[in-house]
Amino acid sequence: MYAIIETGGKQYMVREGDVLKVEKLNYPEGEVIALDKVLAVSFEDGNVEFGKPYLENVKVTAKVLEHGKGPKIRVFKYKPKKNYRRRQGHRQPYTKIQIEKIEK
């Protein structure tokens, strides 16, 4: 059984027990959250249900494992012959979650 969920403006295909990094969620570590923006779900018997745009009766529960920052990305811009150089770094925050249950 798998589900396609939406969180942080992105879509993820998840199964029970999956661990994935999503955009930062404002929940403390260890809390169980409900992801209710479910776009599609596939059952063991092969049936697939799609939402318009979301399924009302399907809920995915996940546990927040940790918060962190991704790898550093360096942005460098310059103008030739003008001695203008700017360097900036960015680390995207993320939340690591584990899918516990997909229930209808």
From Swiss-Prot:
Source organism, top-level taxon: Bacteria
One Pfam family matching this protein: Ribosomal_L21p
An MF annotation (GO) of this entry: rRNA binding
One cellular component term from this protein's GO annotations in UniProt: ribonucleoprotein complex
Keywords from the UniProt entry: Ribonucleoprotein, Ribosomal protein, RNA-binding, rRNA-binding
InterPro entries, per database record: bL21-like (IPR028909), bL21-like_sf (IPR036164), Ribosomal_bL21 (IPR001787), Ribosomal_bL21_CS (IPR018258)
GO biological process, one term: translation
Disulfide pairings: none
Membership in a protein family: Belongs to the bacterial ribosomal protein bL21 family.
Subunit structure: Part of the 50S ribosomal subunit. Contacts protein L20.
Protein task: This protein binds to 23S rRNA in the presence of protein L20.
Protein name per the record: Large ribosomal subunit protein bL21
Species assigned in the record: Caldanaerobacter subterraneus subsp. tengcongensis (strain DSM 15242 / JCM 11007 / NBRC 100824 / MB4) (Thermoanaerobacter tengcongensis)
